[in-house]
Amino acid sequence: MTAEEKRATVQLVCVLGAYLAYVAIVLVRAAGGPVTAVDYVAPLVGSILVSIVVSIVVNIVINAVSSTSRDRKDARDRTIDRFGEHSGRWGLIAGATLALILAMLRVDPFWIANALYLGFALAGVTAGLAKLVAYRRGLRTW
């Protein structure tokens, strides 16, 4: 497994884990009541920060332990990274579009914030999955 493939795996796990933890915290705090009544800001910001910190720490540990992590990016890594980021963009666009529509409809800020976070999470998960699939199966040549 190349260093970039390891980074893609770490990114995928961190993004997905943080988002699922956030959703679980909000649902537990709602305890059957309306989710819009839950104080969601601290768990949302906290889950994002924890995801970033864990991702950085795990990548540092992987680089320290693994000899393959010191490899530089080659053309294949750059192509796969670009492919993954382009694949993930639709999630971000969908989340931002949904948030914009919700704002125009004057929906509760809870739903707007969660639409944005869902978009970011979808973008991260889709990009991570696309990169891992590309590393395993290769990219199609046209």
Task: Locate each region found by the language model.
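Alpha-helical transmembrane segments
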Residues: 39-57, 115-122
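Alpha-helical transmembrane segments of multipass membrane proteins
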Residues: 14, 18-22, 50-58, 95, ...
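Alpha-helical transmembrane segments and their membrane-interface junctions
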Residues: 92-113
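Alpha-helical transmembrane segments and their immediate juxtamembrane interface regions
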Residues: 116-142
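Loop-to-transmembrane-helix entry motif
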Residues: 44-48, 84-91
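Membrane-helix interface/capping segments
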Residues: 59-79
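Long, highly hydrophobic alpha-helical transmembrane signal-anchor segments
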Residues: 2-46
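Membrane interfacial helix-start motif at the N-side
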Residues: 1, 5, 76-89
